[in-house]
């Protein structure tokens, strides 16, 4: 398999996670405690960033940026089976690097534990909707 699509998946996933996490950090800092404003700012930044990344990397790798997307497309026969494992490894590595980049940009510890509880049926329903919806 050529290296270019693998690099596109790693870089695209890293930039996507840096955008999602970075805009979330910035929105929380600037929103003055207004969660609705913070979520709106994060959603707009994420949507714009995702559009740009798909436009840039779509022609190179298909712009999966998510292991579930890769597995779904592979299972449906829309992506070659030989691409699945390299793409997933690239996506996981890119995701970690993207979060680290966001933390670096905002002078936060590279590794830190979340102070927010992220559990329960609502969280799982949101994740399922975002992933499979």
Label every PLM stretch briefly.
Residues 1-133:
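Membrane-interface helix-loop junctions and terminal tails of multi-pass membrane proteins
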